Amino acid sequence: MKLNELKPNEGSRRNRKRVGRGTSSGYGKTAGRGQKGQLARTGGKTRLGFEGGQMPLFRRMPKRGFKNVNRKEYAIINLNDLNRFDDGSEVTIDTLKSSGLVKKELAGVKLLANGELKVKLTVKVNKVSEAAKKAVEAAGGTVEVI
């Protein structure tokens, strides 16, 4: 067997339907577009969401809310994520990035109280929840908001 002798399996490939190539093909003359009208013309499609002149659904629905351009998004770190660090070590944004806990460059890092902290740490983050601060201090560590 040679490379030039390779053929696809029978029935696995189908020939493309070539329209407008003579009346005996079954798809000659109008090429499956019907008679006259918008859809028989080139470029004869309606825009997305067009409902024939009826008020489209997206305009019938009421507007809701807005996008706050000043919103800051923080990378979320939970207490159980901090258990991987050594006892007594200092946790900064740089150490969180190098350990892979923070991947995106956002407005900062926020510490939340999900899970249980078992090691004593000095945590330096941009924001911290009240419960997370109490949990870090209960474990013997400190929290510094930078």
Curated annotation (Swiss-Prot):
Query: What residue spans carry the Basic and acidic residues bias annotation?
Result: 1-13
Q: Write the record's keywords in alphabetical order, separated by commas.
A: Ribonucleoprotein, Ribosomal protein, RNA-binding, rRNA-binding
One GO-annotated biological process of the protein: translation
Which GO MF terms are attached to this record?
A: rRNA binding; structural constituent of ribosome
Please give an example of a GO cellular component term from this record. Answer: cytosolic large ribosomal subunit
Q: Which InterPro entries match?
A: Ribosomal_uL15, Ribosomal_uL15/eL18, Ribosomal_uL15/eL18_sf, Ribosomal_uL15_bac-type, Ribosomal_uL15_CS
Q: Where is the composition biased (Gly residues)?
A: 23-35
Name the SUPFAM superfamilies on file.
Ribosomal proteins L15p and L18e
Q: Where is this region: Disordered?
A: 1-54
Q: Origin, by domain of life?
A: Bacteria
Q: To which protein family does this belong?
A: Belongs to the universal ribosomal protein uL15 family.
What is the purpose of this protein? Answer: Binds to the 23S rRNA.
NCBIfam families hit by this protein: rplO_bact (TIGR01071)
Subunit structure and binding partners: Part of the 50S ribosomal subunit.
- What is this protein called in UniProt? Large ribosomal subunit protein uL15
Annotated source species: Lactobacillus gasseri (strain ATCC 33323 / DSM 20243 / BCRC 14619 / CIP 102991 / JCM 1131 / KCTC 3163 / NCIMB 11718 / NCTC 13722 / AM63)
